[in-house]
Amino acid sequence: MSDILKKRSSMTTDGDNRAPNRAMLRAVGFTDEDFHKPMIGIASTWSEVTPCNIHINKLAEKVKEGVRTAGGVPQIYGTITVSDGITMGHEGMHFSLPSREVIADSIEIVSNAMRHDGVIAIGGCDKNMPGCLMALCRIDAPSIFVYGGTILPGHCDGQDVDIVSIFEAVGKFNAGKISREEFIRIEQNACPGAGSCGGMYTANTMSSAIEALGMSLPGSASMPAVSSRKSEDCYEAGKALINLIQKGVTPKRILTKKAFENAITVVLVLGGSTNAVLHLIAIAKEIGVDLTLEDFDRISKKTPHLADLKPGGRYAMTDLDKVGGVHGVMKYLLKEGMLHGDCLTVTGKTIAENLMDMPDLVPNQTIVRKKSEALHPSGPLVILKGNLAPEGAVAKISGLKKISITGPAKVFESEDDCFNAIMTDQIKPGDVIIIRYEGPKGGPGMREMLAVTSALVGKGLGEDVGLMTDGRFSGGTHGLVVGHISPEAFDGGPIAIVQNGDAVTIDSGKNLLQVEISQEEIQKRLKNWKPIEPRYKSGVLAKYAKLVQSATNGAITNLL
């Protein structure tokens, strides 16, 4: 191998002065020949804490094989993961979004310290994807992301079930709509094995976005975790990285503004998670691309929602995979002039070149509609502003018959208080719930509200109640909900001064979020507002709260 392939690792392995470095590398298996090969870091998020990542050690070994075959020398190392599903609904969820930053920091630290010539990151659970991409942006060596893959659906009483099924069953059981036996059966069958949550929830949304960005191999996003194709995907990624090193292609050449526009388009067409807004902005900031809420709003207004996928629709990612996958959707969008086909990807080819030889969506399939038969003529992710969110907020309207509400505010200072109110029947049709002090700083950690929204759906209130928060929502959430309200309550945003009984309006059709009081009254209340004490005085959450930026800036902690 030419020294041109060892631009980074040569400072670790070359010359007499690096004999001590080589001695230690020999102890981990390096041979004389290996010192002349590019060193490849394989960042593995393997963990036993979640089904999303339980299999990733095996995938990392397949990547390692591919790297070896192509002439590189691989080094697997670990980073963390947090299970969003298992931390949902309690104090543990405060740590989920901060884990994105730790993943990014740890991969940056290891691969920059070891001077890896290229990096492959493998992720499964929600925060893995953006965390890995943020790190690859910072390192800016030739890089590929590999998605661990989606879980297969569970089966219960003749129906497919998944993790959201059991979250919603909590509300149904509490309301007496299902028996304890049914409740237990759903719990026992919702998650049949390895892989990320199966609808177009956050993990599958971000895997789709990353394929559209050009940072994973074509077809990677929709393969099931336990399929032989996923193992092959990992092997091919290992080989492809050496090609990228030879061509000198790094994330800065791939992750352009047009690439992010492609990702946003794919997310909107698929009906993806609101978390994509937060994470794509964060990734863009790391690579130096100016991406804002206005970009999402602009693209959403001209992009139809085409895919009938959960949580708002009927189908799972495995169903989409059977009819052509995310790459099939992208091929259709390219033909319709909705994607930038000239964007470079990790194959060393453009989006258009990659899709040329990929199969079309299966004829007569019912999962992805044609533009002329769209589920909705514009995108399901809606950016709202108004006197409650001067800097912006994000709503998702897929699958909703009702996209606006005006009603009396029911104000809660935390998710926990709101959940208890729902379960004790204190929330009535027409109410607009406000959960505040759950933002990036105030939470801290911007908790996801899946327990709350699922309880509302289970109680039959999903479309009869509005909900807004400076926190976030799981990709599994559906209902008339608004998150990411900025400025957050902790920073003195107007959401902090809403009182019980104030008339509040959510109007996704008009992109409006407001409290029906005068500007003078808002200013008067803000003048009398006093900030709350930080909830954590030490440890990682205290540090995070001091560093984190607003949701409109992707809730990043990097000092950009």
UniProtKB/Swiss-Prot annotation:
Its EC number is 4.2.1.9. It catalyses: (2R)-2,3-dihydroxy-3-methylbutanoate = 3-methyl-2-oxobutanoate + H2O; (2R,3R)-2,3-dihydroxy-3-methylpentanoate = (S)-3-methyl-2-oxopentanoate + H2O. Keywords: 2Fe-2S, Amino-acid biosynthesis, Branched-chain amino acid biosynthesis, Iron, Iron-sulfur, Lyase, Magnesium, Metal-binding. Binds 1 [2Fe-2S] cluster per subunit. This cluster acts as a Lewis acid cofactor. Pathway: Amino-acid biosynthesis; L-isoleucine biosynthesis; L-isoleucine from 2-oxobutanoate: step 3/4; Amino-acid biosynthesis; L-valine biosynthesis; L-valine from pyruvate: step 3/4. GO terms for molecular function: 2 iron, 2 sulfur cluster binding; dihydroxy-acid dehydratase activity; magnesium ion binding. Homodimer. [2Fe-2S] cluster binds at C52, C125, C197. One of its GO terms (biological process) is L-valine biosynthetic process. NCBIfam families: ilvD (TIGR00110), PRK00911.1 (NF002068). The modification N6-carboxylysine is found at K127. InterPro entries: DHAD_IlvD/Edd, Dihydro-acid_dehy_C, DihydroxyA_deHydtase, DiOHA_6PGluconate_deHydtase_CS, ILV_EDD_C, ILV_EDD_N, IlvD/EDD_N. The gene is ilvD. It comes from Leptospira borgpetersenii serovar Hardjo-bovis (strain JB197). The active site is at S474. Its cofactor is [2Fe-2S] cluster; Mg(2+). Mg(2+) binds at D84, D126, K127, E448. Belongs to the IlvD/Edd family. This is Dihydroxy-acid dehydratase. It is an enzyme of class 4 (lyase). It comes from the Bacteria. Functions in the biosynthesis of branched-chain amino acids. Catalyzes the dehydration of (2R,3R)-2,3-dihydroxy-3-methylpentanoate (2,3-dihydroxy-3-methylvalerate) into 2-oxo-3-methylpentanoate (2-oxo-3-methylvalerate) and of (2R)-2,3-dihydroxy-3-methylbutanoate (2,3-dihydroxyisovalerate) into 2-oxo-3-methylbutanoate (2-oxoisovalerate), the penultimate precursor to L-isoleucine and L-valine, respectively.
